[in-house]
Amino acid sequence: MEYMTESTDRSPGHILCCECGVPISPNPANICVACLRSKVDISQGIPKQVSISFCKQCQRYFQPPGTWIQCALESRELLALCLKKIKAPLSKVRLVDAGFVWTEPHSKRLKVKLTVQKEVMNGAILQQVFVVDYVVQSQMCGDCHRVEAKDFWKAVIQVRQKTLHKKTFYHLEQLILKYGMHQNTLRIKEIHDGLDFYYSSKQHAQKMVEFLQCTVPCRYKASQRLISQDIHSNTYNYKSTFSVEIVPICKDNVVCLSPKLAQSLGNMNQICVCIRVTSAIHLIDPNTLQVADIDGSTFWSHPFNSLCHPKQLEEFIVMECSIVRDIKRAAGAGMISKKHTLGEVWVQKTSEMNTDKQYFCRTHLGHLLNPGDLVLGFDLANCNLNDEHVNKMNSDRVPDVVLIKKSYDRTKRQRRRNWKLKELARERENMDTDDERQYQDFLEDLEEDEAIRKNVNIYRDSAIPVESDTDDEGAPRISLAEMLEDLHISQDATGEEGASMMT
């Protein structure tokens, strides 16, 4: 015999709330949600209104105990800062969600919506949503306070070079811009023989000094002065000064090495030409094309000076030029330059064209010179050389003329220059009238030497039409592939996307 069983739907049982008697599903507390919320407030102890400090000058928020950070409105960084203000009472509950409630940017109010959970009576978990109101209070940070009080810098770097030309400083300026080493500076001041960099902390100044040691041959001395002290907290306030001295050698200088240094560099001749100054001094012997690099420590151990300054450059015309194919190398000689060609030339001063006086010399510019070309050089035969190493040399080993570079029409080169460079924002005082000519010399060096401009950001000048890489005279030019577009990306006052805090 078979029995038919009826399928029955099971429904959960209900109980009555012990407070109000409303039928509810069973729970560990045996109480409805409404009554549980009326009896228990899990947000109790969490402040509903908190103040937060904001500096109007630098657009930064104060993060205890002593840090100022830059945050955009409704950003993750600002939300983390707001939650840290209530970190202690918030640790008693479980934070489920947090987010901003939109407010007017100028209202000086920040509202954060929090969702928290907490275990209450008999293991029941209660979830609650509430809003914390943050009042933005204006407070000037310590850095801005020192700026307004004209006592803002803690460290200064005084960069000096004892030369009559600023080619090294122009190159150093472009390296600073390329690698962004000027971002932490408070002020940059230019004087007639160097630059002063002001910083708000000694650590930033030390980082800049390390950068200078990696980019130019130099040495430095550090000193500090006590400004104030607090005997109760045992704190001291110092101002630090870093005196950086760059080697007094620039590109296109003619130098005379000491016999000991010349021998250590591969028995090269003492009279050399400086073809480049980077982290080391790059020299070339115009008689043999032998090259050598001298770092800062070697220079200060065996110092030498420039025999002539740029204002003593004279213009010569090439009368005859022949390439020297067979270069005799002495025993123990150093490296030979592959970018230059040794040539023997007869030249005559353009100021002495009415005479028959000509000069014979060897030069490293044999690949550039042809009869009739103009070239700039130093006349060592008719100038007074006041150098201890030259005075001890045999007069037969001192050349009459040292050629430096080929001469082109400067006006035409400026007119066809379709690129530009950026400059550091700095204060200037006691500027020389010769600065513009020196800057044009630096721009010409960039066009002529690819090794110098590879670490320089060159921007295309849209106002000048694009032409060929060389002009009618054969003057070198920078190709369009080496140029960057000059972009101007604007940011809001907070430094990121989002509305700015209006005060």
Swiss-Prot record:
Tell me the residues on which N-acetylmethionine occurs. 1
Q: Which GO terms describe its molecular function?
A: ribosomal large subunit binding
Could you provide one GO biological process annotation from this protein's UniProt record?
A: protein transport
This protein's major location comes to cytoplasm
Annotated region (Necessary for the nuclear export of the 60S ribosomal subunit) at 425-503
The protein's location, in the record's own words, is: Cytoplasm; Nucleus
From the record, which residues define motif Nuclear export signal?
480-489
Q: Residues where Phosphothreonine occurs?
A: 433, 470
One Pfam assignment: NMD3_OB
User: Subunit composition?
Assistant: Found in a 60S ribosomal subunit export complex with RAN and XPO1. Interacts with XPO1. Associates with pre-60S ribosomal particles.
Give the family this protein belongs to, as stated in its UniProt record.
Answer: Belongs to the NMD3 family.
Q: What does this protein do?
A: Acts as an adapter for the XPO1/CRM1-mediated export of the 60S ribosomal subunit.
* Database matches in PANTHER family: 60S RIBOSOMAL EXPORT PROTEIN NMD3, NONSENSE-MEDIATED MRNA DECAY PROTEIN 3
Q: What is this protein's name?
A: 60S ribosomal export protein NMD3
What is the originating organism of this protein? Pongo abelii (Sumatran orangutan)
